[in-house]
Amino acid sequence: MEMRLEYLGSTLVAKLDGELDQSCAAEIRERIDNEINLHGITNLVMDFNNVSFMDSSGIGVLIGRYKQIKARGGKMLV
C-alpha cells in the first residue's frame, strides 16, 4: 500500500494505491491521524480510485477517521 498526501487548506487528501488490509491498516491510520493532529485538519478526502482490495481492517480505518473528523466538526469524503 502506498499513500500520497495533499493539503488543500484545512482539507487532507489521502490518495491510496494498492490493498488496504491488516498488514498496513495500522500504519495508514497512524499517518493520517498524525497529519490531522499536526496540521489541524478538519476535512478528509480518502481517494480509493487505486485501491484494489480492502478487508475489515480497512473498514475500521475508514470508520475511525470518520468519527475523528466528525468530532472536529468536519466532513469526510471517500
Task: Go through each PLM region and give its residues.
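Amphipathic alpha-helical interaction surfaces in cytosolic regulatory modules
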Residues: 22-78
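Short beta-strand/loop segment at the start of cytosolic alpha/beta domains
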Residues: 1-15
